[in-house]
Amino acid sequence: MGFWKFSPFLPLSILVLYQVGIIQAAPFRSALESLPDPAVLPEEESRLLLAALVKDYVQMKVRALEQEQETGGASITAQKRSCNTASCLTHRLAGLLSSAGSMANSNLLPTEMGFKVSGRRRRDLQA
């Protein structure tokens, strides 16, 4: 009984597919094989295309070099990365303290002070 419900649908679908062009008497590929492949260029056109690509590339490089010469090459600057970890900060503070300590030793301490002066005995002072 279900077959009778689909019988009018079958010829209608065949007619629609025929009109769309899916069903043909001749194979569809034979028509495509006779056409030349659009991706294949003749040798002369491929040479012209290659020459145009090379010319554009050279012009682009010349413009980049001219811009670099105009700016003087100063557009690229090297910067040291800042480190914010605890070990980097400790190392930086230790460097600052050591440089501050060396400045304090050379500038602020009197010349008569030192490890040899503070431990002198009377005998050394009289001699």
Curated annotation (Swiss-Prot):
Per UniProt, the keywords (alphabetical) are: Amidation, Cleavage on pair of basic residues, Disulfide bond, Hormone, Secreted, Signal
* Predominant location: secreted
SS bond partners: C83-C88
User: For this UniProt entry, which residues form the secretion signal?
Assistant: 1-25
- Serine amide: residues bearing it: S118
Q: Name one GO cellular component term.
A: extracellular space
UniProt propeptide residues: 26-79, 124-127
Query: Listed GO molecular functions?
Result: calcitonin receptor binding; hormone activity
| BP terms from Gene Ontology | adenylate cyclase-activating G protein-coupled receptor signaling pathway; regulation of cytosolic calcium ion concentration
What InterPro entries does the entry give? Calcitonin-like (IPR021117), Calcitonin/adrenomedullin (IPR021116), Calcitonin_gene-rel_peptide (IPR015476), Calcitonin_peptide-like (IPR001693)
Q: Where in the cell is it found?
A: Secreted
A Pfam family hit: Calc_CGRP_IAPP
Gene3D superfamilies according to UniProt = 6.10.250.2190
Tell me, in a sentence or two, what this protein's role is: CGRP1/CALCA is a peptide hormone that induces vasodilation mediated by the CALCRL-RAMP1 receptor complex. Dilates a variety of vessels including the coronary, cerebral and systemic vasculature. Its abundance in the CNS also points toward a neurotransmitter or neuromodulator role. It also elevates platelet cAMP. CGRP1 can also bind and activate CALCR-RAMP1 (AMYR1) receptor complex.
| Similarity comment | Belongs to the calcitonin family.
Q: What is this protein called?
A: Calcitonin gene-related peptide 1
